[in-house]
Amino acid sequence: MSRYASGDSAQAAHSARRASHKMPEGSATSSLPTILGEVLKREVAAVQDYWLLSAQALQCMFSAPYYWLDTLEQMDIVGVGSLPIIILAGLSIGGVLVLQTAAQFQRFGETALTGDAVSLALVRELGPAVTALLVSGRNASGMASELGSMVVTEQVDAMRALGTDPIRKLMMPRVIATVLMVPLLTVVFDFVGLCGGFLVASTTLRLGAVQFWTRAINALDIGDVVQGLTKPVVFGLIIATVGCYCGLRVKGGTQGVGRATTTAVVISSVCALIVDFFLSRLLLYLFQ
């Protein structure tokens, strides 16, 4: 009798524990809108904080002091440091473009149009977009990790204590350098891509240098050049401001620095691609 009583008591205790761990469905359902509301408010506040920080950085460009040595150093990091990957990517993409387009033009006996297609594709779209993605992956992450490390080690707080504006000292040189260097890197990418396309066209299609380069240059007009140089300026501004924002708003120590680095690359790349679409629509409307 005692054995049955002890078994019943054990089963009752087990049932009580299961009931205590089970969450009521009503409370889970009622908390979901609250959680979504908190997430939405947090994201809206982050976007607002980003725009305020970017506006402060742009405002600093029109008043002294200017940290020109820091700006030149950042231009070297962003521009010269990115040249190898820009050149390699340009050669590869230019050659692949010729291979893909030539196969279609050969069906109609119009292989001479290869130069036109490669030139327009590189200058209008691929040059600015691919350059922005490469610079974002290399430099937005570097800005976020560098500034995030300074925040974690309290160097930014020490800078404020000494009366130095961190936005003017740290963010403004990076923004200026990136806005100036991304268009130049895009020009390098376009030229190297055309060179890579010519190498492939001359070996596989037997196109002469005069024929290829004449068609490639004549295919472009002023609208294509403006479109190819306007996009990189906007992309450079996005890359620099997002990278600096993610770095200056690091929380959570060294783990936060790692998260900020990843976030900077993802957000800047996605924003560049989204803005690319709307800029293309606007510029095509203006120059067609």
Residue ranges and their predicted role:
Residues 88-95, 149, 179, 183, ...:
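Generic alpha-helical transmembrane segments of integral inner-membrane proteins
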Residues 114-157, 185, 242:
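Hydrophobic alpha-helical transmembrane segments of multi-pass membrane transport proteins
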Residues 100-123, 191-233, 237, 241-263, ...:
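Membrane-interfacial helix-loop-helix connectors in multipass membrane proteins
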